[in-house]
Structures are given as C-alpha cells and as structure tokens.
Amino acid sequence: MGRQLKSGKGATPRLSSVVMVYYKGMLTNGKVFDDNTRQSYPDAMRLKDLIVGWHIALQKMKVGDKWITYIPSKFGYGSRALKGIPKNSTLIFEIELCGIA
C-alpha cells in the first residue's frame, strides 16, 4: 500500500489517537488536491475520523516516519466525488507523522 521515505523512531498511533501530520494528496495523474506541507505547523486530526486508507497506513507508521501511500478508492472516498477528487479515484498521499496526542 505504500513505502517509507524517511524512518522515525517514535510511537505508533492507535485508531483513537489524534495525529499531527504534514501531507500532500494527489490523484494518479499527479494533480494535487490537498497540501499542508507549506504550513509552519502540522495539522492535528483524529485518526478515526479520516479515510480507512489513512487508518491502515498511520497505524503502521512511527512518529518521524514519512511515507508515500497509494489508497484504492474502496479505502478512500469510493463512489463519492469531492471537490477536486473524481469518484472511484485511487489516491496518493505523502504523509509525515510529526506527533501523537
């Protein structure tokens, strides 16, 4: 589902965790639909509120890891189209896990 770009040594989040992440979301054609990597601080999000693909990937990551992960539509938004994301899209995310609350 993905590969590690940078290795961390911190804790691994649980589904109930709040994670602090930098991320960039792209379609398979390279179009970026979301990107917070230029912010001065990572976003804090409750893991259980995110798409299933993020549940799977982040529960395998350690704080300090950076991954690129490929999320099939069934673990993303499925048949729902969102702004900038067509229905049934495979999603590509670069995710850096910066912390766990």
Predicted ranges, named:
Residues 1-101:
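Cross-family detector of peptidyl-prolyl cis-trans isomerase
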